[in-house]
Amino acid sequence: MAFPAPASAAAHTVYVSPSGTGTDCSSAQPCSLAAAQAEVRSLNDAMSDDIVVQLADGVYRPAQPLRLTAEDSGSGGHTVVWRAAPSARPVITGARAVTGWSVSDTGKNIWKADVPAGLDARQLYVDGAVATRARTQVNRADFTASSAGMRFSGGALSYLNNLADQSRIEVESVNSFTDRYSPVQSIGGNFITMQQPAWNNNNFGYDTLMRPHRAGPFYLSNAYEFLDSPGEWYLNPTAGTLYYKPLAGQNMSSVSVELPRLQSLVNVGGTYGEPAHHLTFSGITFTGTSWLGPSSNQGYADQQTGAYLAGDWNWPSFDSCHNGCTQFEAARPHWRQMPAAVQVSAAHTITFTDSRFVNLGQTAIGIGNDAGAHTSGVGLGAADITVTRSEIARSSAGGILVGGVRADAHHPSDQRMVNRDITISNNRIHDLGADHRGIVSVLTTYVTNSTVAQNEVYNMPYSGMSIGFGWGANDAGGSNHYANRGLYNYQPRYTTPTTASNNRLVGNYIHDVMQQMNDGGCIYTLGWNPSALISRNHCLRTNGHFGLYFDEGSKYYKADNNVFSNTGTWATANYWGGENMGSWTVTNNWSTNGSTNVTNGDRGNVVAGNVTVTNGNWPSGAQDVMASAGPKDTTPPPTTARQIVGAQS
């Protein structure tokens, strides 16, 4: 895909190429990304026009993430633009190409290649797709859990006692709305001893590893002995050997294999006093990361759409908190967020356009997340941030996560922390959640003024889009339900509103979602959101799950002129403990499923003019919504997996 040249030339162009050296940064002698950054810093004190960092075609493999601060920003109202050269498709990757394959096991068709010893990764990208880490699916009923781990029956599972590298093995439990990872310590005597604190953290709260609300697939993963299906891989970092069992038709002499080295690619952010600002990225592919957090003894104790529990906590007895307890509420205010591959915080006037975010080992883009999710150490504080005309696809977790989940996100101690004025438009977001299934395409938690419009979302394991967070517990006056749970023993019961207001989902085409998880829908909401608008969206095929889902604490939403086709219940509310819910205006929507528990007059709701459509007889208004939803014609088309693979440089 070629990207158009700008209408007018900028005052100064810094030229970059994958093989660039030196500091000239000229068209004749282009430089590296790092040298280009230094050149910009020598030019941007008093800009009279934009500075363009022009990336030539090819694959850039930086040794470390690109870190942009106030020193790298525009000035005088002008912008520093990092963009593709005309007709170029530059790729910035955190991975290394793996070549030199040879047969390791002829009978099993397992191949191997040398990689640097000590290099670890949770993902491998083969021909532009996320390959499957070696695993075996097991029956939950064959395991009995205790505070130390799991006992299993003998017989067919006896081989587990003899697995090599046992401390690298993980248990994955795909549940209702959480997808959890817990690492093994050792195996012997038909007992799997689990690493702490991951085991405890994964078994307390709700939808837990061993007591899920819905028991989905249960895996043991990351052992060479599990390498038995085409498309699987295993990495031995001690020996520096990568193993792969090719898919049918894959030729290991020509296949593209990318092994991630970096955990993130770009970090844009300064401080609240000196934020990064006036930066644009255009026409660039960002790819090739692997977030290693779940590989530690913390595992990944998934809680809700990319928020997870870590750390050591004073839990009660093992069997006493599988469906919530007071001690779990002590941990809730301290949940963490998955760090994204591209991070923006303490920044304003930042744009990503005409770009691709593919083959990433975590959430693709994090905007104003909590401090712990940013390598800068400064979270939140994102304003006037735009992601447009781009593709986010074929990655391990979610698409775009805007906002934090901790106290400074919803009741900031410094007003400069407020996330505001975020635009996410005309993007195609699809085929996500390869490794972390409890995610969505776009989530705005605590944000003031966001517009998520004209995007296409599809092939998602969980909900399509989500607004809000906190289950109403952090909203003004709090929640009696969470008071009874004991939450306010550990955090304030706030009397003032959160920062969430005036957030809009408009004109999006969301289809083929909820493909693997439960307890979600096409559009999902949590918490209060004054002046929130959900309008003119087209929801199609939710695998029998909800169309519009008002979950706990949802309040002050307006939903009108949306189309819900081939969904389960078209509009539902989870009133469990929901005394602070309602005040919704749900009008003039069309659906093929007439069932709903959202009624007019209840809890201050206005529900009117909604139409159940049969036999495909869509009224003209609904047809107009369906025709206009999704990206405009100027949005670049989605790519196939092979199209994003770059040549070795």
Language model segments and positions:
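Secretory targeting and sorting signals
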Residues: 1-11
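The right-handed parallel beta-helix/beta-solenoid scaffold, focusing on the short coil/turn
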Residues: 12, 49-51, 58, 64, ...
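The substrate-binding groove and active-site-proximal loops of carbohydrate-active enzymes
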Residues: 331-343, 366-379, 405-416, 434, ...
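Extracellular polysaccharide-degrading/modifying enzymes targeting complex plant/algal/animal polysaccharides
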Residues: 15-346, 351-358, 372-380, 408-414, ...
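Extracellular beta-strand solenoid repeats
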Residues: 54, 61, 67, 81-83, ...
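Short glycine/acidic-rich loop motifs that flank beta-strands on beta-rich extracellular proteins
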Residues: 64-65, 263, 290-296, 339, ...
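Extracellular beta-rich repeat passengers
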Residues: 132, 136-138, 292, 544, ...
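Right-handed parallel beta-helix
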Residues: 277-288, 324-329, 348-362, 379-397, ...
